[in-house]
């Protein structure tokens, strides 16, 4: 399931993040890439152990915790601490698939995270740069994503994807992975659609007798499928 989620960050949070990231020291993004990805990757990345990276990561995690849509769609069990990258001057990242498992370096690499869901949080105004589209190959074909600053897109970690060359300006984003309670994307999509339908029915017809039954179906499916 490819899903844009708007306004994960507020304007105040965006301003705070931009101020901190503008003052950061960036490194060659290939340092953190796997062998195959390093051949396609050309960008700058904020070192994971830098104080600014940790502060910015905490801010993003706090924003995610307030997004009911993110929780409903991803059903997170673990979230890899958000990372930050920057593209400019024609930089790009060719087609690749994310590693199946990431090891959280902030915990000494001892805490593996299965990358069921990939996520990109856009931090630059789309009018401030040319190119930089996130191109994702999914079951419905090729999807090109370029969202307003503060908006998030999530998609299956199994997806082949790339970042197009940035030919003008600078594209800054946060990216991270989620280990979901449901590793199966089709099951996540089904429960998300059911949850959205229950919420709409609650708004349109409060007290409808089917709400209790539908909510029970949701939780019984989650109970059957969840890995917790």
From Swiss-Prot:
HAMAP family: Hydroxyl_YbiX. The keyword Iron applies. Gene3D superfamilies: q2cbj1_9rhob like domain, Rabenosyn, Rab binding domain. SUPFAM superfamilies: Clavaminate synthase-like. Its EC number is 1.14.11.-. Its cofactor is Fe(2+); L-ascorbate. GO terms for molecular function: 2-oxoglutarate-dependent dioxygenase activity; iron ion binding; L-ascorbic acid binding. It is an enzyme of class 1 (oxidoreductase). Pfam families: 2OG-FeII_Oxy_3, PKHD_C. 2-oxoglutarate binds at residue 171. GO terms for biological process: DNA damage response; intracellular iron ion homeostasis. Fe cation binds at residues 96, 98, 161. Keywords: Dioxygenase, Iron, Metal-binding, Oxidoreductase, Vitamin C. It comes from the Bacteria. This is PKHD-type hydroxylase XCC2773. The keyword Transferase does not apply. Residues 78-180 form the Fe2OG dioxygenase domain. Binds 1 Fe(2+) ion per subunit.
